[in-house]
């Protein structure tokens, strides 16, 4: 039970947002007024206990990304993804696809994003390879992904974060760096991984976290500590593309390392990777190195503790009666409670 709104003609607002006497409300498919966070696409809107929309609250978002899989621990990670109903991005190696098709299909089913991390994570950085070889690295992986789950990657990450503008343009997809590096390939300890991430002063709304799902301590950190902690702090965990869309960024064939408000306001979200070719030490198992992202020229992110910041734009709402213009025929009970319901 809950509150609902009856029009003079006996109809009810249902299934969407409605502007009533200058105040915006949200109603579920049964016509009950919604409170708290309400999702509309990839965006979230906050409605007070009286049902009124509060534009001063913005739900902070972070994108968790995992490189070099899929591996033997990926299913454990997906169990947690499913448990908390979150989305993450997997930047996969094509050579690891065969034999783990069901895992990749599960990623897609759970709403995770499929990313391309080349075929075999070549030790030679991409800027030192000819264009045909680079294209083959990404194309072979996409071919394997299509065979495994019926779709190619939507986003890419270069090994060591190193790629030239020409190569990136030829691949023709958005490339993602990161703003917080877990150093999990080096630390190999769940507690240390967690502390490395949470002690990053730039961690906040719009951050992109780099981890690897091929290491057991990394997955243990993510499933037992990091994901629950970020959710407790109020963060919504989304894919990199969802994060971009929520921030009203149209992805291009460019390089992205964060979607902080400071970066958005300064107009420096989309970049080019030609200067980000510093190579890092690679681990013995082929995972990546340690250097931080190319976001060093970006000021640190807001909302370190996951507090809500102000300034969401009320213009996202139309002034119509509801999203789909639908009304109920008034058959619901008229009594109600006053409650609400490695690189």
Q: Residue spans of the language-model regions?
A:
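Extracellular adhesion/carbohydrate-binding repeat motifs centered on closely spaced tryptophans
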Residues: 1-59
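A mature extracytoplasmic/lumenal domain signature
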Residues: 10, 29-31, 51, 68-70, ...
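C-terminal domain-boundary segment and adjacent tail
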Residues: 83-84, 96-98, 217-278
